[in-house]
UniProtKB/Swiss-Prot annotation:
Cofactors: [4Fe-4S] cluster
Topology with respect to the bilayer: Peripheral membrane protein
Summary of the function given for this chain in its UniProt record: NDH-1 shuttles electrons from NADH, via FMN and iron-sulfur (Fe-S) centers, to quinones in the respiratory chain. The immediate electron acceptor for the enzyme in this species is believed to be menaquinone. Couples the redox reaction to proton translocation (for every two electrons transferred, four hydrogen ions are translocated across the cytoplasmic membrane), and thus conserves the redox energy in a proton gradient.
HAMAP family given in the database record: NDH1_NuoI (MF_01351)
Keywords: 4Fe-4S, Cell membrane, Iron, Iron-sulfur, Membrane, Metal-binding, NAD, Quinone, Repeat, Translocase
Amino-acid positions noted as binding [4Fe-4S] cluster 1 in the UniProt annotation, renumbered to this chain: 81, 84, 87, 136
4Fe-4S ferredoxin-type domain sequence ranges: 71-101, 117-146
Species of origin: Mycobacterium tuberculosis (strain ATCC 25618 / H37Rv)
Quaternary structure and interacting proteins, as annotated: NDH-1 is composed of 14 different subunits. Subunits NuoA, H, J, K, L, M, N constitute the membrane sector of the complex.
Record localization: Cell membrane
A GO CC term attached to the entry: cytosol
Protein known as: NADH-quinone oxidoreductase subunit I
Cofactor note: Binds 2 [4Fe-4S] clusters per subunit.
Binding site for [4Fe-4S] cluster 2: 91, 126, 129, 132
């Protein structure tokens, strides 16, 4: 039998919306919110654009930017790399692989005793730190401003020597070829060798001709 002594719970009546939340005032508020949202768009339309037209117009890079590596040449075309492997030892990411070989008088690629026969840089590992540049004793390895290294094939991101060597200038001869007559590997290192020949020899010849 049901207990009829319990007091009945008060009935909750739904609170009708106030007249302030409906009608013209509410519609005016919604309209102002929409206009405020478009105000941000309209205000940005007349500002200077920050979009860069890449890749049609590549943006500038910093003066000391660490981009793709380059194996440099001497002015006569011989390679600066001597295959010492110091760059590979200095690399913290183990991204460089070098195999050195001996030069001969019949087949000379660099002024010294050895040259880099195999040179690879794995750009899947390279972190662009530049420690390899600091370790190079002949300034053979530098970093360019080229930053477009993305590819859809992992194998193509392992750069071989032919892709790293600096292009031959018109006055250079493609190695292998003999050293400049009268020049030693020290003359090459000190920058005394030019595309025309050994600087000291050329200057003395010019002085003798003038006499």
């Amino acid at each position: 039998m049901a207990n009829t002594d319990r007091p009945a719970l008060p009935h909750k009546r739904a609170v009708p919306p106030s007249r302030a939340d409906s009608g013209p005032r509410r519609r005016r508020t919604k309209l102002l919110d929409a206009v405020a949202g478009f105000g941000v768009t309209l205000g940005s339309m007349f500002k200077k654009t920050v979009t860069e037209e890449y890749p049609e117009r590549p943006g500038p890079v910093a003066a000391r930017y660490h981009g793709r590596h380059q194996l440099n040449r001497y002015p006569d075309g011989l390679e600066k790399c001597i295959g010492c492997e110091l760059c590979a030892w200095a690399c913290p990411a183990d991204a460089i692989y070098v195999e050195g070989a001996d030069n001969t008088e019949e087949e000379r690629f660099s002024p010294g005793e050895r040259y880099g026969r195999v040179y690879q840089i794995n750009y899947l590992r390279c972190i662009g730190c530049g420690l390899c540049i600091e370790a190079c004793p002949t300034r053979a390895l530098t970093m360019t401003y080229d930053y477009e290294l993305a590819d859809d094939n992992r194998a193509d991101l392992i750069y071989e020597k032919d892709r790293l060597l600096a292009p031959l200038l018109p006055e250079m001869a493609a190695p292998p070829h003999p050293r400049t007559p009268g020049a030693t590997d020290k003359d090459y290192y000190l920058g005394n060798v030019t595309a025309e020949g050994l600087r000291g020899v050329r200057e003395s010849q010019t002085t003798g001709d003038s006499r």
